[in-house]
Amino acid sequence: MNALQEDTPPGPSTVFRPPTSSRPLETPHCREIRIGIAGITITLSLCGCANARAPTLRSATADNSESTGFKNVPDLRTDQPKPPSKKRSCDPSEYRVSELKESLTTTTPSRPRTARRCIRL
């Protein structure tokens, strides 16, 4: 009574369930798309579809599918350690040297000192 046909297009009260297969159909008009997300690869076989180009910043042809994305984005597929970050030294002698340099530059007098002459009458 509630049997669903797998080849019927979706209607107002019908659930459309397309046939699923683990192997792609062998036709000259099939396109295979591989999508990699967080270590998982999804392979889509699109058969009987028309070719349409929609260039975006992340689009690539099937031949160049490994070269998508920006150059500055790190490759998350490898587990390489991060390079050590530059840390400030906590050596007290270095702090004193920088403190002395600051005090020498900030305590310069506003006008040069001159010898005062006293005039006696």
From Swiss-Prot:
GO cellular component terms, A-Z: host cell nucleus
Biased composition range(s): Polar residues: 58-70
Pfam short name (any one): CAV_VP3
Biased composition (Basic and acidic residues): 88-102
Induction details: VP1 and VP2 are detected 12 hours post infection, while VP3 only after 24 hours.
Keywords: Apoptosis, Early protein, Host nucleus, Host-virus interaction, Inhibition of host mitotic exit by virus, Modulation of host cell cycle by virus
Stretches for region Disordered: 1-28, 57-121
Compartments in which it is found: Host nucleus
Domain of life: Viruses
Predominant place of localization: host cell
GO BP field: symbiont-mediated activation of host apoptosis; symbiont-mediated perturbation of host exit from mitosis
Family according to the record: Belongs to the gyrovirus apoptin family.
Function: May act as transcriptional regulator. Induces apoptosis in infected cells. Element of infectious replication cycle.
Protein name (Swiss-Prot/TrEMBL): Apoptin
Biological classification of the source: Viruses, Viruses incertae sedis, Anelloviridae, Gyrovirus, Gyrovirus chickenanemia
